[in-house]
């Protein structure tokens, strides 16, 4: 099933329509003196290649070819349209085509005329109008047949001596236990350096015994992930902006180890993002003593070495409070704060050591940072966050929001998951929460603890968005 996107441009010329196919394999664009003279597309249906008609007229200025790899597809077309010379109707003056994997036919740049875009999923056909030039262009977009994620929020009962009211901390799951470390109650004042452990069977918090290289700083803006039975903790700062190094905690022996002193590892920071796969721990962005960062570093737990990943392009600005998740071998950076809230999405391919920015669509969440996030199958699920900075910066609450959204990393489509006030246990607006991917009572989902309230108070609740189908 495909949706027909309206053709953008002028009304002059004959209408043409290539129809719908499985994929687009090649695009031919002919140049005219003032814009696009003609286009032609090659499509794929199964093993058959279908060569479309020429729309417009070739000139002596040549033809450019753009080939799409067999395992890739077009997700975004950007163009400009304008009335040229004495034309009574607009023509297309510029086209740039971008694929899911980030391949582009031309650098996307501002041009004279009116900008238009065609996107919304996998593009599987084109239509438009033409005379001796291309006057308009539209597209067909394949609609995903993926079933919407079905789930609901529950408030998890808590007993025992837990983290209590706090924000800016980190949590991670190992087996049937959730661990919490760091955080603040009063702005910029870390609370303690206990490692709290929540038993999912008894719903009871306790303070974990600790031996070895116990972190010497109580810290806020810290992040923590788990790989197997080991927790990894990086960064965070105290009230005087002294920073923590990189630690591991073996949950089977309750032993801390200082893996990398603060002066030997990646740039010390707070309010960064962390994620992990089976062999690597990733650290992205955050705020150092002097600036925000946009670097990605990975630590291989087998080799016990840091690797500084390739530098992203200018479009991935330095930021804190971003979502960072590993999905199907790619490391995804979602939104964040670079002086203002942003809504761009990028992924890093560790095999190619390459960054790609993607264009998302659907029911997109507004710009935000310091939200809860989790990776569930091919989806990234987020909740809440800050949508506008407070005039007092971190001392104030900022403008905080709610809402549960999921990004399908294959189709690049966002959807809203929760109901609008329809569930009693839906969390209230908040940011600066601690969150992780978790499995509770056999369901995988997003678990989050605490956070900052719109009143600038702190939460101490524990919520879980469990997925029934994915």
Swiss-Prot record:
Signal peptide: none
Domain Jacalin-type lectin: 2-143
Domain of life: Eukaryota
Tissue spec. comment: Expressed in seedlings, leaves and roots. Observed in seeds.
Kelch repeats: from-to residues: 177-225, 230-276, 280-329, 331-375, 379-434
Effects seen without this gene: Reduced simple nitrile levels in favor of isothiocyanates in tissues corresponding to its main basal expression. Abnormal accumulation of glucosinolate in seeds, during stratification and germination.
Regulation: If the presence of Fe(2+) is not required for the production of nitriles with benzylglucosinolate as substrate, Fe(2+) is mandatory with 2-propenylglucosinolate and enhances the global lyase activity in a dose-dependent manner. More active at pH 7.4 than at pH 6.
Single annotated GO MF: lyase activity
Pfam families: Jacalin (PF01419), Kelch_KLHDC2_KLHL20_DRC7 (PF24681)
E.C. no: 4.8.1.5
SUPFAM superfamilies recorded: Kelch motif (SSF117281), Mannose-binding lectins (SSF51101)
Extra information: The proton donor differs depending on substrates.
Protein family per UniProt: Belongs to the jacalin lectin family.
Protein name (record): Thiohydroximate-O-sulfate sulfur/sulfate-lyase (nitrile-forming) NSP1
Classification lineage: Eukaryota, Viridiplantae, Streptophyta, Embryophyta, Tracheophyta
Annotated gene: NSP1
